[in-house]
From Swiss-Prot:
Keywords: Cell cycle, Cell division, Cell inner membrane, Cell membrane, Cell shape, Cell wall biogenesis/degradation, Magnesium, Membrane, Metal-binding, Peptidoglycan synthesis, Transferase, Transmembrane, Transmembrane helix. Belongs to the glycosyltransferase 4 family. MraY subfamily. Pathway: Cell wall biogenesis; peptidoglycan biosynthesis. One of its GO terms (cellular component) is plasma membrane. The gene is mraY. GO terms for biological process: cell division; cell wall organization; peptidoglycan biosynthetic process; regulation of cell shape. The keyword Cell membrane applies. It comes from Dechloromonas aromatica (strain RCB). PANTHER family: PHOSPHO-N-ACETYLMURAMOYL-PENTAPEPTIDE-TRANSFERASE, PHOSPHO-N-ACETYLMURAMOYL-PENTAPEPTIDE-TRANSFERASE HOMOLOG. The chain crosses the membrane at residues 27-47, 73-93, 97-117, 132-152, 167-187, 200-220, 237-257, 264-284, 289-309, 344-364. InterPro entries: Glycosyl_transferase_4, PNAcMuramoyl-5peptid_Trfase, PNAcMuramoyl-5peptid_Trfase_CS. Signal peptide: none annotated. This is Phospho-N-acetylmuramoyl-pentapeptide-transferase.
Length: 367
């Protein structure tokens, strides 16, 4: 929106040409989203509290979490509003990838919002039925996969890129690409949601990964840099920097209120949407494996739940009683049960994410 205005004004005042630079607009997007989150946060929290949209806490969870009962949830709405407004302000609205990530993000946000709403307003502990949640996640994931696949301009835009190797890329074909894209988007969405169990635990890794992928998107959308780094050139992908900058800014603004002790929780509306956003971006810039590396915390949290549930069902069938691998899943609760304080778990997981993000960025050059 503002880009179009700047381009029109640039016909008479050359200064406005500066807004054609993606890097400048990405920084402005991050700042705008941050300020929007900080400014609107108190009002959103007050509204959620007034409507008694509070978090229910598991009785079988860590006893230290019982004090969190009633804390306003669905704060992810604040993040999505900041991301949406900022991207529309600073993004190139003629870019197909901008609309792709916006539609997917807001679509998953709506699914998460309805799930949260049923839990906290209608007091339904199960929220949106799992089959319906999975159905709508699948519709959005497959829809995005089809659009990206059939709008690709070259075979390289649908190949699986293997990090650390100069020329190792596997042609996926349409079916393979759609399948991979589906699992990346849906899987990342649910992985972030599973991780969102402690104050600040999910949002800061999301901010770090978004910032790192902003750099990746920039070089992927730049023909010269992409050729130099031996990565696929995806025309228009650079514009995702604005969207990713908005995620980073909105996420930091939300962290202001979500840091321990949290004044508000993200809820499924935020976690599902942010995970889907990261997954969609990774697919567009052809760096799904790099997302797997950077999002290692999300991956291990998801695996901990899968192993815990799988082992419990297996032992119950074999021995007549279910047994557990961990004291409690997801993994962050296991560490709490072993004596780690909540803030220790969160900060240590942040440190791990910093290391993984640096490893992921190193794949751009180490080939």
């Amino acid at each position: 929106m503002l880009l179009a205005l700047a381009q029109w004004l640039a016909q008479d005042v050359r200064f406005f040409n500066v807004f054609n630079y993606i890097t400048l607009r990405a920084v402005l997007a991050a700042m705008t989203a941050l300020l929007l989150s900080l400014a609107a946060g108190p009002a959103v929290i007050r509204w959620l509290a007034a409507k008694k949209i509070g978090q229910a806490v598991r009785n079988d969870g860590p006893q230290t979490h019982l004090v969190k009962s009633g804390t306003p949830t669905m704060g992810g709405v604040l993040i999505l509003i900041a991301i949406g407004i900022t991207t529309l302000l600073w993004g190139d609205l003629t870019n197909k990838y901008v609309w792709t990530v916006l539609v997917v993000t807001l679509g998953y946000g709506i699914v998460g919002w309805y799930d949260d709403w049923k839990k906290v307003v209608y007091r339904d502990p199960n929220g949106l039925a799992s089959r319906w949640k999975f159905f709508w996640q699948s519709v959005l994931g497959i829809g995005a996969a089809l659009f990206i696949a059939f709008s690709a301009k070259s075979p390289a835009q649908t190949e699986l890129i293997i990090p650390f190797f100069k020329t190792m890329a596997y042609p996926l074909g349409v079916i393979g690409f759609i399948t991979l894209t589906y699992f990346v988007i849906v899987g990342t969405s649910n992985a972030v949601n599973l991780t969102d169990g402690l104050d600040g635990l999910a949002i800061m890794p999301t901010v770090m990964i978004a910032a790192a992928f902003a750099l990746i998107a920039y070089v992927t959308g730049h023909a010269v840099y992409a050729k130099y780094l031996l990565i696929p050139y995806v025309p228009g992908a650079g514009e995702l920097c604005i969207f990713l900058g908005a995620i980073a800014g909105a996420g930091l603004g939300f962290l202001w209120f979500n840091a321990y002790p949290a004044e508000v929780f993200m809820g499924d509306v935020g976690a599902l949407a942010l995970g889907a956003a990261l997954g969609t971006v990774a697919v567009i810039v052809r760096q799904e494996i790099v997302l797997l590396i950077m999002g290692g915390v999300f991956v291990i949290e998801t695996l901990s739940v899968m192993l815990q549930v799988g082992y419990f069902k297996y032992t119950k069938r074999k021995y007549g009683e279910g047994r557990r691998i961990l004291r409690m899943a997801p993994l962050h609760h296991h560490f709490e049960q072993t004596g780690w304080k909540e803030t220790q778990v969160v900060v240590r997981f942040w440190i791990i994410t910093i290391m993984l993000v640096l490893i992921g960025l190193s794949t751009l050059k180490l080939r």
